[in-house]
Structures are given as C-alpha cells and as structure tokens.
UniProtKB/Swiss-Prot annotation:
Segments carrying motif CC1 box: 76-80
Source organism: Xenopus tropicalis
Family membership noted in the UniProt record: Belongs to the BICDR family.
Record's subunit section: Part of a tripartite complex with dynein and dynactin, acts an adapter linking the dynein motor complex and dynactin. Interacts with KIF1C. Interacts with RAB6A and RAB6B; interaction is specific to Rab6.
Keywords: Coiled coil, Cytoplasm, Cytoskeleton, Neurogenesis, Transport
Protein encoded by which gene: bicdl1
Location of region: Disordered: 1-27, 352-375
Name by which UniProt lists this protein: BICD family-like cargo adapter 1
Cellular component per GO, a single term: cytoplasm
Function of the molecule: Acts as an adapter protein linking the dynein motor complex to various cargos and converts dynein from a non-processive to a highly processive motor in the presence of dynactin. Facilitates the interaction between dynein and dynactin and activates dynein processivity (the ability to move along a microtubule for a long distance without falling off the track). Predominantly recruits 2 dyneins, which increases both the force and speed of the microtubule motor. Component of secretory vesicle machinery in developing neurons that acts as a regulator of neurite outgrowth.
Domain of life: Eukaryota
Subcellular location: Cytoplasm, Cytoskeleton, Microtubule organizing center, Centrosome
Length: 599
C-alpha cells in the first residue's frame, strides 16, 4: 500500500514543478484517488476476527493476501490508466505551451533586434555629436592655451616696460633735481624783475582807478538813460492815447459840424417858410378885415336894399364863403407845414405818421366844413416852432463849448509834445556825454594796450635773460627727458589697452567654453535619460511578457508572484522624473536579471 502512494507523490512532484498551471485540476484527482486507497485499506483492515483456530487463521490470512493482491492489481491498473491519461494531457499541454513560447520568443527576438538597431542608430548619432563637441572643446582649449601664452608674453613685456619706465623715472628725477636748482636761480632773477615791474605797475594802478571811476560814471549815466527811456516810453504811450482821443474828438466834431450844417439849412428853410407864412397870414388878416367892413356895410344898408341887391348880396355871400373856405384851407396847409417843420426839428420817428395824419386831415378838411379847424392851432404850432429854434440855438452853443474843450485838449497835446521834445533834447545831451565818456574810455584802453606792450617787452627781456643764464646742454637734456617720459607714458597706455583687449578676449573664450561644456552636459543628461527610458520600456515589455507566461501554470504560486510584479510595475510607472538615475539603475539590474533567467 505504501509503494503506490509514494509513487504517486514522486510522480506528482515533477508534474507540479514542470506544469504549475494545471495543479489545481490534478490536485482534485489526486485527492479522490487517495480517498479510494484509504477506503480500500480500511476495508482490508476491518475484517472480522471471529474465526478461531490456526487453520482458519491461515486460510483467512491467505485469503486476505489474495484479496490484497487483487486489490493492489486493481489499484495499479487504475493508477496506470490515470497516469497514462494524465501524461497524455500533460504532453499535449506541454506541446501547446512550447509552441506559444517559441512564438513569443520569436516576437521578442524581433522586437529586441529592432530596439537594438534603433539604439545603435541613436548611439551613432550621439557619438557623432559628442565627437563634434569634443573637437570644439579641443579647439577652444587650443585657443585658450594660445591666449594664455599671449597673456604671459604680454605680462613679460609689461614687466620689461615697467622696469624701463622705472629707470627712466629715476633719470627724470635726477634731471628734475637739476632743473629745480636752475629754477631757484631763475626765481631770484625773476624777483628782481618783479620789483622793477611793481614800480611800473604803480602808474598802471592809478590808470586802473581812473578807469573804475569812469566805469562807475558810465553805469550812473546808463541808469539815468534807462530811466529817461522809460519816461519817454510812458510819455509816448500817453501821447498815442491823447492822439487817439484827439482823432475821436475830431471825428465827433466833424459829425457835429455836419449835423449843425444840416440843422442850419433846416433853420433857414423854416425861417423862410415862417416869413412866407407871416406874409400870407397878414394878407389873410387884411382880407378878413375887408370882409368884416363889407359885412358891417351890408348890415347898415340891408334895410334899403331891394331884391336885386339881395340877390347880389347872396351871390357875394357865396363868393365870400368860398373865399373863406379857401382862406381856411390855406390856414390849414400853413398849420400842417408848421407841424411838419416841428417834427423835422424834433427828429421824432412819429413824423411820418403825423404827416400821414395831416395829409388825411387835409383831404378830409377839403371835404369837411371849416368848423373842424381849431381856433388857436396855428399860434400853438408857431410857439412850438420858436421853442425848437431856441433849443437848436442852445445845441449850437453846446457845440461851440465842445469846440473849446477840443481846443484845450489840443493845447494839452501840444504841451506833451513840447515835453517830449525837451526829453529828447535831454537824451541827446546824455548821448553826447556818453560819447565823450566812450572816447575817454577808448583813450584809456589805448593807454592800457601801451602798458601791455611794455609788459610784453619786459617779459621778453626776462626770457632773454633766462635764456642767457641757462646752459644749452641742460635744456637739451630736459627736452630729451620730457620726450622720453611722454613716449614711455604712451607705450604704457598702449600696453594697458592691449592687456585689456586680451582680458576681454579671454573672458569671451571662457564664456564660450563654459557654454560648450554646459551643452555637452545637457546632451549627456539627455542621452542618459533617453537610455533610461529605453531600458525602462524594454524592462516593462519583458516583465509584461514574463508575467503572462508565469500566470498560465499553477495559480497558487503565480498569485503571490503576480502581485509582487504588479506592485513593482505600478511603482515604476508612478516614479517621477527627478529620480531618473535611481530608476535607470534599477531598470538595468532587472534587465540583467531577466537576461540571465532567459538564458
């Protein structure tokens, strides 16, 4: 009984180790088979021991052995059959898995070959770029070395120039000490000449004081001139204003004269008309008196008249009435004329309306009776005419008074013009004085120029004495020393400029080199990041494929392993960019591990 169970356990171990995917299904069959074996063993052990005796026991033991052998044979047959079926299933599944594995391996080999080709292309490109950058860096390093060599040479030249300049400075200091001694001697001579010059400058100081006094007088006169010019400008403005007033008054006077002339003409016409009216009035009064006398005579002779006389009287009465009507009409016309004259003299706007009313009244008076004419209307009109004439005469008197005022203004203008003339004369006098002072200043200027000429002559004499006192050799040495110093200073400035240019070039080259190094670092970082990304992609694909392969056999083993792999994949997916170096290292380790497992 123990041999088949051990055989089963030994045979199940390689199957479980080789094919993990079908472990659950096979485990169920093994459990059923074990249960049957246990059941058979229990049946064999549970036989009754009621038969007594040795023979019976032997027979029973033989029977038990036979039965046990039969059972073992049956079990062996069943087990062989089960094992054959299981081996067939396992071989079939193994062939299928082997096919799938070969297909997947071919696919992975193709992908691996493509990725290798891409990686080689990219590596070739980056190597070319890196080689270019390295060549650029080499060129820049060579240029930097050249610049450093040039700088060293420039420093050497600078040191040599500084040494030469220091030697020249020492020489110049010696020459300066000699020159100071010469200057002391010359200063003594200059002091002597200065004393002589002071004696001559005393006379010039007197001239200068006189010039200052004249300048003060000129300032006073110029101030006076400005004040007079201001007064003249104010007077001229007032004169212009007065001239404007005079012109306005003259215009007003002309207009008033024209009005007076027109009114004089109107007065003359009105006076002539009044005289004519008076003559007509006297004639009318004479006619009225004659008519009254005739009337009185007719009343006296009325008693003694006859029919013929009555007829004649009636005819005469009609004629008298006609004459009276004519007289009344003439009186009315005279009244209208007087009223029109009054209206013209007043200058009212209602003159036209009055004339129109008068004309209408004339027309109505011709048709109406003579009783409509007022009794004292002519006298009132004449009185109005007299009052108007008196008012016109008064206006003429006022115009004459205005003329007197205009005459006064003209006199004031004449006085202002005389004052302006006097001011102009004063200005002319001041200008003459200014000219005199200017002439005096010119004379003083001439004297000053003469003094300056004398001073120049004295300076020339002093220079001549200095030239005589100085030695020709010392002067030449001084000139040479000054020239050498100037040349050394110019050389020093040129060298400093060249050094500054070299420093600027070196700084620019350093910046270019730093930029190139920075670009190289950036490119190397990009290349590393790209390599890490490629490794990560390859690792991810390989891990996915292996997970698919491992998930097909036994589920009990693959569950825990699958969970671990999923957690690793999730951790790799959710990893951030800043940790690229650690992720790349882990990916490389996983890639090497997977390669080893694959081999």
């Amino acid at each position: 009984m123990e041999l088949p169970i051990s055989f089963l356990s030994d045979s199940s171990r390689p199957a479980a180790s080789s094919e993990r995917g079908d472990q659950a299904a096979l485990g169920r069959g093994e459990l059923e088979f074990d249960e049957e074996l246990v059941f058979l063993a229990a049946e064999g052990e549970g036989d009754p021991e009621e038969i007594e005796g040795p023979e019976v026991r032997e027979q029973s033991e033989l029977l038990c052995i036979i039965r046990q052998k039969e059972k073992d044979l049956v079990l062996a047959a069943r087990l062989g059959k089960a094992l054959l079926e299981r081996n067939q299933d396992m071989s079939r599944r193994y062939e299928e898995m082997q096919r799938e594995m070969t297909d997947k391996l071919e696919h992975l080999e193709q992908e691996k070959h493509e990725l290798k080709r891409k990686l080689e292309n990219r590596e070739g490109e980056w190597e070319g770029r890196v080689s270019e950058l390295e060549s650029d860096v080499k060129l820049l390093q060579e240029e930097l070395e050249k610049q450093q060599v040039n700088l060293r040479e420039a420093d050497r030249e600078k040191l040599s120039v500084v040494q030469e300049l220091s030697e020249q400075n020492q020489r110049l200091l010696e020459q300066l000490s000699r020159a100071t001694e010469m200057e002391r001697q010359l200063s003594q001579q200059v002091n002597v000449l200065q004393e002589e010059f002071r004696e001559k400058s005393l006379s010039t100081s007197q001239h200068v004081s006189r010039l200052e006094s004249l300048l003060a007088e000129i300032k006073m006169l110029s101030d006076r001139k400005r004040e007079l010019e201001q007064q003249l400008s104010t007077i001229m403005e007032e004169n212009e204003q007065l001239q404007g007033l005079v012109e306005e008054l003259q215009d007003k006077e002309l207009s008033l004269n024209q009005q007076n002339f027109g009114k004089d003409l109107q007065l003359r016409e009105s006076q002539l008309e009044i005289e004519e009216m008076r003559l007509s009035y006297r004639q009318l009064e004479g006619k009225l008196e004659e008519l009254r006398e005739e009337k009185s005579l007719q009343h006296m002779n009325s008693t003694s008249t006859s029919l013929l006389s009555e007829i004649e009287q009636s005819i005469e009465a009609e004629e008298q009435e006609q004459e009276r009507e004519q007289l009344r009409l003439q009186l009315w016309e005279a009244h209208c004329q007087v009223r029109s004259l009054c209206c013209q003299l007043r200058g009212n706007e209602s003159a036209d309306s009055a004339v129109s009313t008068d004309s209408s009244m004339d027309e109505s008076s011709e048709t109406s009776s003579a009783k409509d004419v007022p009794a004292g209307s002519l006298r009132t009109a004449l009185s109005e005419l007299k009052s108007l004439i008196l008012s016109i005469l008064e206006t003429c008197d006022s115009a004459s008074s205005r003329k007197c005022e205009d005459d006064g203004l003209e006199e004031q203008i004449k006085q202002t013009s005389e004052d302006s003339r006097a001011l102009r004369e004063l200005l002319q006098g001041e200008q003459m004085r200014m000219k005199q002072t200017f002439d005096e200043l010119q004379e003083l200027h001439k004297q000053v120029t003469l003094l300056s000429v004398e001073m120049n002559a004295l300076k020339e004499e002093r220079d001549r004495l200095l030239v005589l006192t100085q030695n020709d050799e010392t002067q030449e040495q001084l000139m040479k020393a000054i020239k050498d110093r100037d040349e050394a200073i110019s050389k020093k400035t040129a060298v400093e400029l060249e050094l500054a240019k070299c420093r600027i070039d070196l700084m620019s080259l350093n910046t270019q080199l730093l930029d190139a190094i920075q670009q190289k670092l950036n490119l190397s970082q990009q290349l590393e990041a790209w390599q890490d990304d490629m490794h990560r992609v390859i690792d991810q694909q390989l891990m996915d494929k292996h997970q698919k392969e491992w998930s097909q056999p036994a589920y009990s083993f693959s569950n825990s392993h699958h969970v671990k792999q999923c957690s690793k994949a999730a951790a790799m997916k959710h990893a951030e960019r800043p940790g690229e170096e650690s992720i790349g290292a882990e990916g490389r380790r996983l890639f090497s591990f997977l390669k080893k497992t694959k081999c």
